[in-house]
């Protein structure tokens, strides 16, 4: 169905009830005749309206074939990048939560060990990170 035919049907469906109302007010037709004409027009438009899903399906098929409904490659890439950035933010938030949980667990455990144990734990990394020098004594390494 062409756009012009659809437009015409919409106008007819809009104008007929108004014309019938004016004719009824001016006395050109009685209420029974207006109701009958209105029923006939409404029935005809309902038959046309029943074809609306088929018309819509044909129109969507045309739009799909000519590429109206497909997204451009730029839009696809943009959406993909946005999804990757969102996933990155979620992963960073998860890592931060794990870090906080570990820090709270370690910080909670160290004060319970006492000050001497804290000094030992804090000194482990510097002690093992010193380079080996065969001229130093074992007690001074």
Swiss-Prot record:
A GO term for molecular function: pore-forming activity
Family annotation (Pfam families): Phage_holin_7_1
Domain of life: Viruses
Keyword Transit peptide recorded: no
Membrane topology: Multi-pass membrane protein
GO terms of biological process kind: viral release via pore formation in host cell membrane
Localization annotation: Host cell inner membrane
Coiled coil regions in record: 74-108
Main localization (coarse): host cell
Ranges that cross the membrane: 9-29, 37-57
Record's keyword annotation contains Ribosomal protein: no
Sorted UniProt keywords: Coiled coil, Cytolysis, Host cell inner membrane, Host cell lysis by virus, Host cell membrane, Host membrane, Membrane, Transmembrane, Transmembrane helix, Viral release from host cell
GO CC terms in record: host cell plasma membrane; membrane
Quaternary structure note: Homomultimer. Self-associates to form a pore.
Family: Belongs to the Mycobacterium phage D29 holin family.
Function: Accumulates harmlessly in the cytoplasmic membrane until it reaches a critical concentration that triggers the formation of micron-scale pores (holes) causing host cell membrane disruption and endolysin escape into the periplasmic space. Determines the precise timing of host cell lysis. Participates with the endolysin protein in the sequential events which lead to the programmed host cell lysis releasing the mature viral particles from the host cell.
Domain notes: The first transmembrane region undergoes a helix to beta-hairpin conformational change, which is responsible for its self-association and pore formation in the host membrane. The coiled coil region is required for host cell lysis and for cytotoxic activity. The C-terminus determines the size of the hole.
Name of the protein this chain belongs to: Holin
Protein's organism: Mycobacterium phage D29 (Mycobacteriophage D29)
Gene from which the chain derives: 11
């Amino acid at each position: 169905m062409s756009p012009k035919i659809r437009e015409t049907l919409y106008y007819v469906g809009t104008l007929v009830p108004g014309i019938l109302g004016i004719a009824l007010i001016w006395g050109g037709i009685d209420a029974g005749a207006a109701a009958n004409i209105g029923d006939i027009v409404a029935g005809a438009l309902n038959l046309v309206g029943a074809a609306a899903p088929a018309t819509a399906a044909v129109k969507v098929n045309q739009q799909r074939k000519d590429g109206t409904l497909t997204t451009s490659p730029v839009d696809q890439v943009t959406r993909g990048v946005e999804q990757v950035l969102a996933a990155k933010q979620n992963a960073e938030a998860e890592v931060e939560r794990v870090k906080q949980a570990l820090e709270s667990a370690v910080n909670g455990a160290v004060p319970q060990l006492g000050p001497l144990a804290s000094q030992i734990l804090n000194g482990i990394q510097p002690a093992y990170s010193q380079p080996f020098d065969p001229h130093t004594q074992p007690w001074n390494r």
